[in-house]
């Protein structure tokens, strides 16, 4: 359960990085 929680948080951070920072780079 702990491992799954860690992976979910890591995945969410990566998604935020790509969709947040990435979109700002492409669309600004």
From Swiss-Prot:
One of its GO terms (cellular component) is host cell cytoplasm. Coiled coil: none annotated. Plays a role in the reorganization of host microtubules and intermediate filaments to form a cytoskeletal cage that surrounds the viral factories, protecting the site of viral replication. May play a role in viral infection of human cortical neurons. It comes from Zika virus (isolate ZIKV/Human/French Polynesia/10087PF/2013). Signal peptide: none annotated. This is uORF1 protein. Keywords: Host cytoplasm, Host cytoskeleton. Product of an upstream open reading frame of the genome polyprotein gene. The initiator methionine is coded by an unusual start codon CTG. Its main location: host cell. It is found in: Host cytoplasm; Host cytoplasm, Host cytoskeleton. It comes from the Viruses.
